[in-house]
Regions:
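Long terminal segments
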Residues: 1-43, 47-52, 58-151
Length: 151
């Protein structure tokens, strides 16, 4: 039986940009974020209850998100995450004082978004049929993995 793969490719930030590559294989999100020197492996399970998994292997961090009332809520590493929406996605990574708001909009197979305010980082992804919330989740996790989790 051949697995259906939906490739997610794109970048986060501009100078320099962070490469994002992931694929959806049935109920798993697998991929790699970052370049050759700072790359982190991504392995997440998607279920009716939420998303869970690990990023960065042994020295990485856990992802544990629960689906409640149309919102994914939980933890990415030590930070809280709240993510709402499917093709128009909004949310927040972190607490009230040090957190980062994000927004993303899907148009067909393209996803464009921003983490943070005016000086925040933009991201652009090609989704190849994958829902926008998954692309946004990959971008937010990449941001945390490469900008906030220093291991």
């Amino acid at each position: 039986m051949k697995l259906v793969q939906n490739e997610i490719t794109g970048s986060l930030g501009t100078n320099p940009s962070i490469e994002l590559k992931a694929r959806l294989e049935q109920d798993r999100i697998l991929g790699r974020v970052g370049g050759a020197l700072m790359a982190k492996e991504l392995a997440l399970e998607v279920s009716e209850k939420g998303v869970s998994g690990r990023v960065g292997g042994k020295n990485g961090f856990d992802v544990s998100l629960e689906l409640k009332a149309g919102e994914l809520s939980g933890f990415v590493g030590l930070e809280t995450l709240h993510l709402r929406g499917v093709d128009q996605v909004t949310g927040r990574l972190g607490n009230t004082l040090g957190g980062v708001d994000f927004i993303a909009n899907q148009n067909a197979d393209s996803l464009r978004g921003r983490l943070g305010g005016i000086k925040g980082q933009t991201f652009e992804l090609e989704l190849a049929g994958t829902p926008g919330w998954i692309g946004t989740l990959v971008a937010v996790i990449a941001f945390y993995a490469l900008e906030r989790h220093k291991n």
